[in-house]
C-alpha cells in the first residue's frame, strides 16, 4: 500500500466509521476528485485497492474500473479483479454522486477474496485506496481508513416480508444513493394534540437497511412543517438523512373514518443499488409515542433506481472576463487558500474550453520545477517571485475564447478559473455590424471594405452628383436589416457580372437629374439619383436596366417618406446575366412607428451609375455600399409588406427636383388592377413617365418562371400595378402575395406566347388597403406634378385593343337606339291609358286575403 501511494501526486485521507448493524454492504464516499468544467471529453482512469486482514496476514484486492465518463454514465462495475474470487466483480459498484464525489460500494456478506477453510470468520476490511488519474496525467489518491476493523461475515440473509402493511401506489425513487418519497398518512389526533415517531426498513436482494429518528419522536406536532433527522445502518453519509411531517387537514376538521391527514417526506441515504428494483420500503409510524413494535401503523412503497446522471461533477469555478488590445493577453493565477510560500508541490493546468482531443488538447501543465511543456500551443506560463503564476495567451483572433485554469497545492486543495479573453475592437479599421432583429441573414454587410470606416450621417454637396442621403429619424429599425453600417458616396464606375454600365445620356428622355441639399423643414425634400434608361424596359441578357430613387425623409413632416432602393440584393437566382434590381421602401416619418414596406429581393444584379451597392436601413438611417459580387441574403418582411415571389423588378419612382408640397392623398381612391387609362396612373403600358405613375418591368427569369406555360427561353415583361396607398402588389405565376404570403389568388397565369418583349398588362387579383385617416403614417409615393383628379377607367381594357367603328358611326348608333326606346315607351303609355278608360267594376269571389273585399 505504501509503495502504491508513492505514485500519487495528491492524496486525500479520511477515516471511515460504520455504525449500527451491518446492512449487507459497505459504502465509502470519496470526495474532491477533479472533474474539469466545460469539458465533455475530460475522462479519468480509476483503480481501487481493497486491503484485507486475514488472520493477521495482509491480502490485497485490485479492481480496475476503467475510464469514467461523467457526462454519459453514473454507475460502474469493475472490468477486472486481481487477487479476488471468481465473482469479485459482481460485489463492487462505483457511483458518481455529483460535485466531484464518488461512492464505492461493496457487499459485506459475501467474500470477494479466496480464503482457506477456517479463515472465513477472520476476514476484516482495513482500508481502501482509490487511484484517480485525470486527463492531464495527474494521479489523485484517496486513502480511506476504517476506524475499527470491519469483519466480513459470510451468511445467507433470509427473505423478510411484513404483513398487515397498507400498500400505496407511490414509488420511492433513488438517485445518486439518495431515496426521496412523499407519502400520505393519517393520525387519530390533530397536530397540536399529537406526537409522532417513525422507523423505516428497506428490504431486497439480501440487503436490509434500517433508519430511525435520532430523537426518538416529535413530542408535539405543530402546524406546518415538522422536520427531523434520521440515522440509517451502515456507513454514515456526509449528507444527512431526514424527514418532514406536514399537517394537511384543517386543525379542527378530522376526516371521517381515518382521522387527520398528514404528509410525510423521507430522504434516507445511502441506499445501495444492490437492493434492486424489486425492493420495498416499509414505513412504521405512531401518533401516540414510540412503540416497541415499531409503530401503530404501517404503509409500504416500491423502490426503483434511476439511471439519471446526477448533478454536475464539475469543480466550482471562478469566472473572469479580460478584454485586451494587441496580440497577447496575460492572467495571473493567485495561490490557493491553504498554500504558502514554502509549499513544495504546486501544479497549474490550462486548456481551452470544450476540447475534443484528449491526446493534444491537454498538454499545458506546469509545476514549480518545470517549464512550459511541449505541445502547449498559444499558451505560456511561469511562476513569479510572489508565487503567482502568469499565463500568457497569443494568436487568439477576434472571437472570444475561454481558458480553464486549475491550481492545486500540496494538500490537494484546488481552485479553478474560467477566463474569457476578448480582443478589443479596433474602431478605426473596421465597421462593426450587428443583427438587430435576429432575422437578417449572415453576411448582410460583407460588401463593406474591411479596412474602411465611414462616419454616419454624411450629406454630399448638391453639386457632387448622385448621392445617397440619410436622415435621423425615430422610426424603429425594420426587421431583416443590419444596423451599424455607414453611408458612403458611391463609385461612378460599377460593374455587374462583367458588363460595364455606361453613364446615362443626359439628352435622352430620362429626366434631368439634380441633387438638392436636403431641407430639414421641407415636407417633400428629396434627392434623385440618375437612372440609366429609367423608363424603357430593356430585357436583353447583357443590357443593364436599373432605376433607383432615394428621397430624403423629412424628420418634421407627418407625410414624409423614404424610398430606399436595394439594388444588387440577392435571393433565389432568377436569371444568369439579366440585370435586375429590387427596391426596398421604408417609411421613416419623424415620429411614426409604421412598419416597413419591403419588396422582396430576388437575386437582382443590376448595374447602376451610382455604384453597385446595397442600402440597409438601421435605427440611425445609415447606409452602406456593396460590390457587384455578393453572397445571397434574405429579406424578411414585416406586416404591410408586398412580396414578389418570382423574378426581379426594376421600379422607377420619379421625384421632383425642387421642393414640392404635392403628395398622394390617402383619401384618393386606389386604381383598380389592370387599369389602362392613357391619362396616367398605374397600369399604363406607355413607356413615358406620367405624373403619379410607377413603371415596373419584369426581368428575364430562367425558363420563363413568370409564365409557366410559355416556351423555354421566352422573355416576358409584365407591368405590376402599384397602388397610391403605398403597397406594391404583384401577381406572379397566378399567386398574389401580401405580407408574409398570407393571401393567395387563383387567378390563372396568362400565356402571351411568341416574343413578348413588349410590356402587356396582366390583370391582377389585388386587394388594396382602405383609405386611412389615422395619425399613423402609411407609405406614400411622391409625384413630379399635382395628382391627377380625373376619373380613372374602371373596366380593364387591353392597351392594344382598337375600336371596330369610327366615332361618327358609334354616335349614329347611339342616337338611333335612343329614338327606338323612346318610341316604344310612348306606345306603352298610350296603351295603358286606353285600357284604363275601358275598365269596369269587378268583385273577387275568392278573396286573396282573410276577409272578402270588393275592389273597383
From Swiss-Prot:
Primary localization: virion
Residues linked to a glycan: 47, 87, 114, 166, 169, 195, 229, 277, 318, 328, 345, 356, 378, 386, 411, 435, 443, 457, 497, 519, 533, 554, 568, 582, 585, 603, 614, 650, 684, 695, 704, 729, 764, 807
Biased composition (Polar residues): 442-488, 575-616, 674-690, 703-730, 743-776
Low complexity composition-biased segments: 427-437, 507-570, 617-631, 654-669, 731-741
Residue stretches spanning the membrane: 810-830
Signal sequence segment: none
PTM characteristics: Extensively glycosylated.
A cellular component term, taken from the record's GO annotations: virion membrane
Bilayer topology: Single-pass membrane protein
UniProt topological domain (Virion surface) ranges: 1-809
Stretch list, region Disordered: 421-779
UniProt topological domain (Intravirion) ranges: 831-856
Keyword Ribonucleoprotein in annotation: no
Keywords associated with the record: Glycoprotein, Host membrane, Host-virus interaction, Late protein, Membrane, Transmembrane, Transmembrane helix, Virion
InterPro entries: GP350_C_dom_herpes, GP350_C_dom_herpes_sf, GP350_N_A_dom_herpes, GP350_N_A_dom_herpes_sf, GP350_N_B_dom_herpes
Uses in biotechnology: Primary surface antigen capable of inducing and reacting with virus-neutralizing antibodies. Almost all EBV candidate vaccines are based on gp350 proteins.
Subcellular location: Virion membrane; Host membrane
Homology family: Belongs to the Epstein-Barr GP350 family.
Subunit structure: Interacts with host CR2.
Role this protein plays: Initiates virion attachment to host B-lymphocyte cell, leading to virus entry. Acts by binding to host CR2 at the surface of B-lymphocytes, facilitating the binding of viral glycoprotein gp42 to HLA class II molecules. Attachment triggers virion-host membrane fusion and invasion of the host cell.
Name under which the protein is recorded: Envelope glycoprotein GP350
Amino acid at each position: 500500500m505504501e509503495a502504491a501511494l508513492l505514485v500519487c501526486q495528491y492524496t486525500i485521507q479520511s477515516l471511515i466509521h460504520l455504525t449500527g448493524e451491518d446492512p449487507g454492504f459497505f459504502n465509502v464516499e470519496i470526495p474532491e476528485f477533479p472533474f474539469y468544467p466545460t469539458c465533455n471529453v475530460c475522462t479519468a482512469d480509476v483503480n481501487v485497492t481493497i486491503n484485507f486482514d486475514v488472520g493477521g496476514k495482509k491480502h490485497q484486492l485490485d479492481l480496475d474500473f476503467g475510464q469514467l465518463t461523467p457526462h454519459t454514465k453514473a454507475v460502474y462495475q469493475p472490468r477486472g479483479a486481481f487477487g479476488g474470487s471468481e465473482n469479485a466483480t459482481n460485489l463492487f459498484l462505483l457511483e458518481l454522486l455529483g460535485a466531484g464525489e464518488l461512492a464505492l460500494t461493496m457487499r459485506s456478506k459475501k467474500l470477494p477474496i479466496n480464503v482457506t477453510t477456517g479463515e472465513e470468520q477472520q476476514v476484516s476490511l482495513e482500508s481502501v485506496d482509490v487511484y484517480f488519474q485525470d486527463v492531464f496525467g495527474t494521479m489523485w489518491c484517496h486513502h480511506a481508513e476504517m476506524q475499527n476493523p470491519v469483519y466480513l461475515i459470510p451468511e445467507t440473509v433470509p427473505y423478510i416480508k411484513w404483513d398487515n402493511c397498507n400498500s400505496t401506489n407511490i414509488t420511492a425513487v433513488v438517485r445518486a444513493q439518495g431515496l426521496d418519497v412523499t407519502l400520505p398518512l393519517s393520525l387519530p389526533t390533530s397536530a397540536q394534540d399529537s406526537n409522532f415517531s417513525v422507523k423505516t426498513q428497506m428490504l431486497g436482494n439480501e440487503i436490509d437497511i434500517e433508519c430511525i429518528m435520532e430523537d426518538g419522536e416529535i413530542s408535539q406536532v405543530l402546524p406546518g412543517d415538522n422536520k427531523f433527522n434520521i440515522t440509517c445502518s451502515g456507513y454514515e453519509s456526509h449528507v444527512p438523512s431526514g424527514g418532514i411531517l406536514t399537517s394537511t387537514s384543517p386543525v379542527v376538521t378530522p376526516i371521517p373514518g381515518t382521522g387527520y391527514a398528514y404528509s410525510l417526506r423521507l430522504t434516507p441515504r445511502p441506499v445501495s443499488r444492490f437492493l434492486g428494483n424489486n425492493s420495498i420500503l416499509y414505513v412504521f409510524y405512531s401518533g401516540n409515542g414510540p412503540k416497541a413494535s415499531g409503530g401503530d401503523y404501517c404503509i409500504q412503497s416500491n423502490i426503483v433506481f434511476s439511471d439519471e446522471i446526477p448533478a454536475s461533477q464539475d469543480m466550482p469555478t471562478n469566472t473572469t472576463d479580460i478584454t485586451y488590445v494587441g496580440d497577447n493577453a496575460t492572467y495571473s493565477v493567485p495561490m490557493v487558500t491553504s498554500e504558502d510560500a514554502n509549499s513544495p508541490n504546486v501544479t497549474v493546468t490550462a486548456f481551452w474550453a470544450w476540447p475534443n482531443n484528449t491526446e493534444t488538447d491537454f498538454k499545458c501543465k506546469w509545476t514549480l520545477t518545470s517549464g512550459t511543456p511541449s505541445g502547449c500551443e498559444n499558451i505560456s506560463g511561469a511562476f513569479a517571485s510572489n508565487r503567482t503564476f502568469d499565463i500568457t495567451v497569443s494568436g487568439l483572433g477576434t472571437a472570444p475564447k475561454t481558458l480553464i485554469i486549475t491550481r492545486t497545492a500540496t494538500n490537494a486543495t484546488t481552485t479553478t478559473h474560467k477566463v474569457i479573453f476578448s480582443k478589443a475592437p479596433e474602431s478605426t479599421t473596421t465597421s462593426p455590424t450587428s443583427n438587430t432583429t435576429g432575422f437578417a441573414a449572415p453576411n448582410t454587410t460583407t460588401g463593406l471594405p474591411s479596412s474602411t470606416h465611414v462616419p454616419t450621417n454624411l450629406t454630399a454637396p448638391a453639386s457632387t452628383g448622385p448621392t445617397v442621403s440619410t436622415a435621423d429619424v425615430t422610426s424603429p429599425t425594420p426587421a431583416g436589416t443590419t444596423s451599424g453600417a455607414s453611408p458612403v458616396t458611391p463609385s461612378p464606375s460599377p460593374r455587374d457580372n462583367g458588363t460595364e454600365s455606361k453613364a446615362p445620356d443626359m439628352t435622352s428622355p430620362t429626366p434631368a437629374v439634380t441633387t438638392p441639399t436636403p431641407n430639414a423643414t421641407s415636407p417633400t425634400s428629396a434627392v434623385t439619383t440618375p437612372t440609366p434608361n429609367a423608363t424603357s424596359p430593356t430585357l436583353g441578357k447583357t443590357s443593364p436596366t436599373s432605376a433607383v430613387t432615394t428621397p430624403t425623409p423629412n424628420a418634421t413632416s407627418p407625410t414624409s417618406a423614404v424610398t430606399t432602393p436595394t439594388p444588387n440584393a440577392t435571393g433565389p437566382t432568377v436569371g444568369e446575366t439579366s440585370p435586375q434590381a429590387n427596391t426596398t421602401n421604408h417609411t421613416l416619418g419623424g415620429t411614426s412607428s409604421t412598419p416597413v414596406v419591403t419588396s422582396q429581393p430576388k437575386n437582382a444584379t443590376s448595374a447602376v451609375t451610382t455604384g453597385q451597392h446595397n442600402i440597409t436601413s438601421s435605427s440611425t438611417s445609415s447606409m452602406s455600399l456593396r460590390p457587384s459580387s455578393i453572397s445571397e441574403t434574405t429579406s424578411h418582411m414585416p406586416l404591410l409588406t408586398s412580396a414578389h415571389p418570382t423574378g426581379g423588378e426594376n421600379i422607377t419612382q420619379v421625384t421632383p427636383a425642387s421642393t414640392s408640397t404635392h403628395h398622394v392623398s390617402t383619401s384618393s381612391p386606389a386604381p383598380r388592377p389592370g387599369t389602362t387609362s392613357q391619362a396616367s396612373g398605374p397600369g399604363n403600358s406607355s413607356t413615358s413617365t406620367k405624373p403619379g405613375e410607377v413603371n415596373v418591368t419584369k426581368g428575364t427569369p430562367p425558363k420563363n418562371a413568370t409564365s409557366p406555360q410559355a416556351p423555354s427561353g421566352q422573355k416576358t415583361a409584365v407591368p405590376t400595378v402599384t397602388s397610391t396607398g403605398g403597397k406594391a402588389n404583384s401577381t406572379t405565376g397566378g399567386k398574389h402575395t401580401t405580407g408574409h404570403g398570407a393571401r393567395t389568388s387563383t387567378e390563372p397565369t396568362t400565356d402571351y406566347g411568341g416574343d413578348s418583349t413588349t410590356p402587356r398588362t396582366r390583370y391582377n387579383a389585388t386587394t388594396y388597403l382602405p383609405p386611412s385617416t389615422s395619425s399613423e403614417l402609411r407609405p406614400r409615393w411622391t409625384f413630379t406634378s399635382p395628382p391627377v383628379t380625373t376619373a380613372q377607367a374602371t373596366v380593364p381594357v387591353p392597351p392594344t385593343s382598337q375600336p371596330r367603328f369610327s366615332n361618327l358611326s358609334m354616335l349614329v348608333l347611339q342616337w338611333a337606339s335612343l329614338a327606338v326606346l323612346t318610341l316604344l315607351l310612348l306606345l306603352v303609355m298610350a296603351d295603358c291609358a286606353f285600357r284604363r278608360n275601358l275598365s269596369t267594376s269587378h268583385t273577387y269571389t275568392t278573396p286573396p286575403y282573410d276577409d272578402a273585399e270588393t275592389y273597383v
